[in-house]
Amino acid sequence: MPPKGWRKNTEGQYPQPNKDQDLVSIDEILFPRATVQKLAKNIMNASSDEGASNMILAKDSMIALQRSSTVFVSHLMFQARQISKDEGRKTINAQDILSALEKAEFSGFIPEVKQKLSVFESNIALRKKHKADKKVPKPEGVDASPSSKRLKDNDEQIIQRDNSADMEDDPEAEADEDITEELANDEDTNNKESKEEEEADEELDDEKDGEEVEENPIALLSREEDELRGEEAADEDEGQNSSDDDS
């Protein structure tokens, strides 16, 4: 339903509101309070003053830091976006940020930013190198089917057992060993359960064979009555035959 007060245009449609005209408050785009507080405490602890480490940030000071940092980063990104746009690029790189600092008259921050950037890049390089060292070379000539994958995993496990000194800290190998152990335990438990079920079925069959089938008591009574009636009929026939003989 359109907002109150809107009227249809000549085409019979309601005009759509312009999203660019929507006002955005600075409180909606503030940086996380914990991040800003951690950075501020690191700066205070890094200072040479003795009482700086015991300083506490007030609530109003934290709000001021959050808002000022948001405005600073927004202004810096605007300058960097203009530089990348002038060079015909759609992405912003590290050099654009350094040029934006110089253009925004914050040249004093450039040495500190370069130092932090070099530390960050070195950490990323070390992380990639450590990750590459952990990778195990795959054996050649192995298909990608599930059965071949299992054989490949088993081969890798044999290699890892032989070269335990080199592959001791490999988390992928430990995970593969845990998975194989779990599968083996599941197979053992399934076999035990199937054996127990078969034994229980055999015991039930033996009990059924050994037990005598009990007859219905009503059927027994009816059978006894039929037998008595048959005996009485036989006695009557004998009596009639004896009387005929006497006559």
Curated annotation (Swiss-Prot):
Database matches in InterPro entries: DNA_Pol-Epsilon_Subunit, Histone-fold, Histone_H2A/H2B/H3
Basic and acidic residues compositional bias, start-end: 150-159
Misc note: In eukaryotes there are five DNA polymerases: alpha, beta, gamma, delta, and epsilon which are responsible for different reactions of DNA synthesis.
Localization of this protein: Nucleus
Complex and partners: Heterotetramer. Consists of four subunits: POL2, DPB2, DPB3 and DPB4.
GO CC terms of this entry: CHRAC; epsilon DNA polymerase complex
Residue ranges, compositional bias (Acidic residues): 165-188, 196-215, 224-247
Domain of life of the native organism: Eukaryota
An MF annotation (GO) of this entry: chromatin DNA binding
GO terms for biological process, alphabetical: DNA damage response; heterochromatin formation; leading strand elongation
Annotated PANTHER family: DNA POLYMERASE EPSILON SUBUNIT 3
Start and end residues of each stretch annotated as Disordered: 128-247
Keywords linked to the UniProt accession: DNA replication, Nucleus
Name of the protein in its database record: DNA polymerase epsilon subunit D
Role this protein plays: As accessory component of the DNA polymerase epsilon (DNA polymerase II) participates in chromosomal DNA replication.
Keyword rRNA-binding: no
Transmembrane segments: none
